[in-house]
Amino acid sequence: MSRILLRGIQCHACRQNVIRSFVSASGVTITPPAIGSVSPSKAHPPHLSGSFPTRHVKLFSSQAKDDPSLAADAVSENSAAQEGSYPQENSEQHVPWYLQEEVQEMALHPMRQQQELPPLPENPPPILKVLLEYISFDIGLDNLNLLDLRTLDPPPALGANLIMIFGTARSVKHLNVSADKFCRWLRTTYKLRPDADGLLGRNELKIKLRRKARRARLVKRAGSTLKQPDDGITTGWICVDVGIVEGGQLSKPEGVQKAGFVGFGTVIQGTRIVVQMMTEEKREEIDLESLWRQTLEKNSMDNPGLPKPQAEEPPQVVGFTHESSTVTAADFSHRVSQTPPIRANYEQLRSISTSLHRLRDKRGSATDFVPTDTTVATKSAKSISSQESLPSLFNYLSNLEPDKAIDELGQGMDDRTSTSFLQRFYEELARTAPQIASAQKLELMCTGILLQHSGYRKEDLFQAFKEHIVSNYPLPRALVLRLLDALLAFKPDPNSNPPRLRLPGADMELALRLIENAALRGTNILHADFLIRVFLAVSYRTRVYAVKPENLHSAAITGNRIPVSIDEFESVQRIQTRLASIIRAAKVALGEKEYLDILRVHSDQGEYAKFWNAWGEVALAGIHRGKSFYLFLFNLHAELGDWQQSRTTLLNCIPMMWREDPPVFFDAELAEVVSKCIALAYPDIDDTVQHNLPALIVKTWHHCRTAIQNQKMNERKERLIQTELGTLPEN
């Protein structure tokens, strides 16, 4: 199954099928998104692909090809065209919108823009164009960038007459396969000897993987963590030195060489090409293009005679922009708005895939909504100040208590004047660009849904999202995750009849359609941010246990667990198993928060075997199981109230704490939680602490009591010191 999944997830068009594959087990039917069903009064109609003139209509006529009337029609059409070139009385006759010619080209799809080739530099080597086409089309690297370093003086360490190409691989496996295939192609086609730094040979990779698996088994058996997570296999960066190729030398004027130049060797005729292959994360991390561009700028300042490199423009999202239509008011509602593409150089395309994510982390989610129209850059100061005030309004709302925040949101989406917050929000919204206004409106609806405001519904949020998509506004990753959190928001109600313990199927359908649209817009949905959210959404939101359907009405709540039908319980398990298979097959990297969520789900469902398997996978992933993990573990068992599970956990996990690297020792917070588990597993611990109990439990109990007493003594000392200094009144 892993091989099939890996083969199917290589393109964005197939990824949404992987996410939706688990829905068949639950019976939820997902229909394709009907984006075009949005009314024109609420959203802009989609951009048409092209015009349909009258000369094309005759090609679909029912007459035969050899009909002589066709020639007559053609002659009459030509004569009519010639007559139409002169002004006539009926020249202002109304022309329907569907017969009007569209002169502007349709913008490229965002995925197509990632595969565009960069422009060739001046006097390129003959092999350069073929090299770029092979890198983009055959091995599938995206977001290609080309830097011409032939003007550097002195030349870089890689050699003189250097041209450097940058490309992004989809994964670490794709990176290694692409580099190996590229080197073999150069050897067989051009008889070159490329040097790939960072590429492991096929046999060497197998040996390292076997050694890593052997170490992982030993670590899991010992109950510890891997000391060196970076094993040198997944570097995420391969530098391929193609070598020196013919042609491409820049013509230097005579007398450029400085007087008194001393050196040896011969001047090499040709151009050296280096290809930097990286994963998207590594490319964002090191930002090698910016470093070389700074070197070029410094070189141009030191050598005034050399051409200056083109300055990198600030990153922007290339998308559709809306212009005012020139048609009459009668058919304005029928005319599709013209959407010319923004022409961007290749450096801007590189910034789209990397710099935007980097700026997003620094500025936060409030500034993720970057305008697409180039005219927005020349807005007035009043409009710019409104963009800065909108995030401040959301910050004000987030600092309020939930009840007060709900009151500030008014009656619902149609309410715009009942509170001062709504009045200020819509006043600022009217002065912003349409792209930002649409995104901020979605943010407001998400806030209302997450606060469980009755006036903000998920159906209205998804309708506003469709209008946002139809208008071709940018869809940042942070906005997608925010929308997904709102659609998957759910509060269980065990007291209802029947109990509401899982997310309704209608809400799950909306969330999956959102993920599908995000995948078609180029978002990587095979990521922990998406998969874990879906995993939690299909799971139960409280502690449950399975019973037969005929015994469901008579079953009682036992041990804080609510009875559910075994058929529904097994359906949830099948969905979770499919999602876990997708995570393993796609090699999705999980973090501490994701593992804690998975552990809680398995504990709520009473799947203790899966719980301890996931606990061991944390160590195999190279994540340190520190204080937060053991606080979660002992708190979970204390809330569960099962003395047998608490006793087993104490005997197994307390020695494991001391074997962690670094070890986890008791402090007051951890000691308090462990004491609760000991009191649950051994109720008479105070009376029989010296009799008939394992030595480990007695030792741990004394450690916990000592840590708690020390904490109380320290707090008492601090209070006395503050009282003496006069900072606190004496009681």
From Swiss-Prot:
Polar residues bias: where?
76-90
Enumerate the UniProt keywords alphabetically. Answer: Membrane, Mitochondrion, Mitochondrion inner membrane, Transit peptide
InterPro entries xref list: Atp25, NT_sf
Targeting signal (transit peptide) range: 1-29
Predominant place of localization: mitochondrion
Please list the GO biological process terms of this entry.
mitochondrial gene expression; mRNA stabilization
The membrane topology of this protein is: Peripheral membrane protein
- According to its UniProt record, where is this protein located? Mitochondrion inner membrane
UniProt-annotated stretches for the region Disordered: 68-93
GO (cellular component) term, any one: mitochondrial inner membrane
Q: What does this protein do?
A: Probable mitochondrial mRNA stabilization factor.
Q: Which family does it belong to?
A: Belongs to the ATP25 family.
From the Swiss-Prot or TrEMBL record, give the protein name. ATPase synthesis protein 25, mitochondrial
What species is this protein from?
Answer: Paracoccidioides brasiliensis (strain Pb03)
